[in-house]
Amino acid sequence: MITAEKKKKNKFLPNFEKQSIYSLRYDEMQQWLIDHGQQKFRAKQIFEWLYQKRVNTIDEMTNLSKELRQILKDHFAMTTLTTVVKQESKDGTIKFLFELQDGYTIETVLMRHEYGNSVCVTTQVGCRIGCTFCASTLGGLKRNLEAGEIVSQVLTVQKALDETNERVSQIVIMGIGEPFENYDEMMDFLRIVNDDNSLNIGARHITVSTSGIIPRIYDFAEEDIQINFAVSLHGAKDEIRSRLMPINRAYNVDKLMEAIRYYQEKTNRRVTFEYGLFGGVNDQLEHARDLAHLIKDLNCHVNLIPVNHVPERNYVKTPKDDIFKFEKELKRLGINATIRREQGSDIDAACGQLRAKERQVETR
């Protein structure tokens, strides 16, 4: 729930007349009802309408009194996302470009796997981290999303899956933006979708990825929630990582590893390192050896990413043979590594690419 204190702390939050009803955690809904002279058991009914029956309006909540429905309408908005573009890949991946109520656009991706349907959500409109391989940073950061706007991405995809009796089984927070720069809203989102009264998506089926905002890694280590944790690494040495990710100049590799070790000491959970392979930059066997040396004492997994070509950036794809050699070298050195299956390569599946294309059209 967005309070005055939250708005003061997070200057990039929107200033809507009404906040999204999807921004309230279950405990916040209970307290809000009590504060407004209602019985807190109504929270269970409201969450059932929102997340199980997935209604589009408060008026459809027919087991609530007209008085309570009116109170809810007076205070909250039912966040809706308008689908501007929907691209479907031959492998079943679907990329959505959604328009928010203030006209900004965000991306959400549905990925189909043998083990279920995974949704990749966005946490910010744009991004200010400045990764040199990512289209998301091209327009800078416009604003943060409310928790309810992040929840609505999952719900909108789930409603589409309802037509074929499928469900969202996994969530990855790897879309546009840096989740740890919108930390409180991200954490509210996690607690909402993980709640038994909501979408009930298991914590171990949710992954959050950061570019390495070190203060928030320490905060995340203290959270009582077993969410999977991934770090975008892309380079084992400062020279290469700073070239790819300018954030490394503020939070270098040594400091990042120190924070990750603290996280593991506190949680005893495995960390995934995302390592995008960029032709001629970080994809040689010497780079694999540097990576293995850096993380050899950690409980971790390396996810090797054959990077989609992004026309807005100048990096090229690493040849398949070199990708396999890189993986083989890591395994030889005792590192658990896999190559991410390419999905959506025939659509604008690189992060921020579809949004960037639409922005070009708008400004012509």
From Swiss-Prot:
Classification via InterPro entries: Aldolase_TIM (IPR013785), Methyltransferase_A (IPR040072), RlmN_N (IPR048641), RNA_MTrfase_RlmN (IPR027492), rRNA_lsu_MTrfase_RlmN/Cfr (IPR004383), rSAM (IPR007197)
Record's cofactor remark: Binds 1 [4Fe-4S] cluster. The cluster is coordinated with 3 cysteines and an exchangeable S-adenosyl-L-methionine.
Alphabetical UniProt keywords: 4Fe-4S, Antibiotic resistance, Cytoplasm, Disulfide bond, Iron, Iron-sulfur, Metal-binding, Methyltransferase, rRNA processing, S-adenosyl-L-methionine, Transferase, tRNA processing
Active site: E107 (proton acceptor), C351 (s-methylcysteine intermediate)
Residues reported in the UniProt entry to bind S-adenosyl-L-methionine: G177, E178, S209, S232, L233, H234, N308
CDD domains noted in UniProt: Radical_SAM
Recorded catalytic activity of this chain's protein: adenosine(2503) in 23S rRNA + 2 reduced [2Fe-2S]-[ferredoxin] + 2 S-adenosyl-L-methionine = 2-methyladenosine(2503) in 23S rRNA + 5'-deoxyadenosine + L-methionine + 2 oxidized [2Fe-2S]-[ferredoxin] + S-adenosyl-L-homocysteine; adenosine(37) in tRNA + 2 reduced [2Fe-2S]-[ferredoxin] + 2 S-adenosyl-L-methionine = 2-methyladenosine(37) in tRNA + 5'-deoxyadenosine + L-methionine + 2 oxidized [2Fe-2S]-[ferredoxin] + S-adenosyl-L-homocysteine
A Pfam family recorded for this sequence: RlmN_N
Xref: PROSITE patterns: RADICAL_SAM
Compartments (UniProt record): Cytoplasm
More about this protein: Reaction proceeds by a ping-pong mechanism involving intermediate methylation of a conserved cysteine residue.
Function of the protein: Specifically methylates position 2 of adenine 2503 in 23S rRNA and position 2 of adenine 37 in tRNAs. Confers resistance to some classes of antibiotics.
Protein name, as recorded: Probable dual-specificity RNA methyltransferase RlmN
Taxon lineage: Bacteria, Bacillati, Bacillota, Bacilli, Bacillales
Gene: rlmN
